[in-house]
Amino acid sequence: MSCKFVLQLLGFWLLLSQPCRARVTKEWLDEVIHVCGREYVRAILDICAATVGLEAPPLRRRRMTEEAVSSFIKEDAEPFDTMPNLSEKPKTALPEGHPSLPEQQQYVPVSSDSVGSLDDFKKSFHATQGEAEDSSLPELKSLYLDTLSRKKRYTSIYMSHQCCFRGCSRRSLTAAC
């Protein structure tokens, strides 16, 4: 073998035998640091860059439910696009004023002279539906998102003050990643 090849092989072996400096140890993560302002942001960026892929994130509740649902699926089940065979015997037609659902049966007028109260009921029912549609999804959604962003903002402000005045571990800062 040539001397150059042996030296290159030795150099390559020495590089591989060196411990990786990019590895994150538990001691490094548990070390308490005091950082304020820009140093706090830089520390978060450094910690997030160093810990990418280090620890698997905890399983979320949604994934657990998906796994539970998939375990109940039968492989020999029929596809959902087929309709079950219904009996060919036609059902007896109900009179037009006769309610078929139990929810409708509780609002049936007692006598024929109470038709006015039925009309009042219909008007009030449609009015309450309109009110329910007025406070619909976009307003509630923005309210929900506002509370989430507010919680995240307060949490990050609290963490920055804690890291500045009392100190915090790098592991606690990984929650911001």
Swiss-Prot record:
S-S bonds:
C36-C164, C48-C177, C163-C168
- Positions annotated as propeptide: 64-149
Which GO-annotated molecular functions does the record name? Answer: hormone activity
UniProt keyword Oxidoreductase, yes or no: no
Instruction: Mark out the compositionally biased spans (Polar residues).
Output: 102-114
Task: Read off the SMART domains from this record.
Answer: IlGF
Arranged from A to Z, the UniProt key words for this protein are: Cleavage on pair of basic residues, Disulfide bond, Hormone, Secreted, Signal
Location comes to: Secreted
Origin: domain of life: Eukaryota
Region Disordered: start-end pairs = 80-114
Pfam families cross-referenced by the UniProt entry: Insulin
> Mind telling me which GO cellular component terms the entry cites?
extracellular region
Against InterPro entries, the record matches this protein to: Insulin-like (IPR016179), Insulin-like_sf (IPR036438), Insulin_CS (IPR022353), Relaxin (IPR022421), Repro_Hormone_Insulin-like (IPR051042)
Q: Which range is the signal sequence, renumbered to this chain? A: 1-22
Q: Which SUPFAM superfamilies match?
A: Insulin-like
PANTHER family given in the database record: PRORELAXIN H2, RELAXIN
The UniProt function text for this chain reads: Relaxin is an ovarian hormone that acts with estrogen to produce dilatation of the birth canal in many mammals. It bears mature young, and allows separation of the pelvic bones.
Subunit relationships: Heterodimer of a B chain and an A chain linked by two disulfide bonds.
Family, according to the entry, reads as follows: Belongs to the insulin family.
In Swiss-Prot or TrEMBL terms, this protein is called Prorelaxin
Which species is this UniProt entry from?
A: Mesocricetus auratus (Golden hamster)
Lineage in the entry?
Answer: Eukaryota, Metazoa, Chordata, Craniata, Vertebrata
Q: Which gene produces this protein?
A: RLN
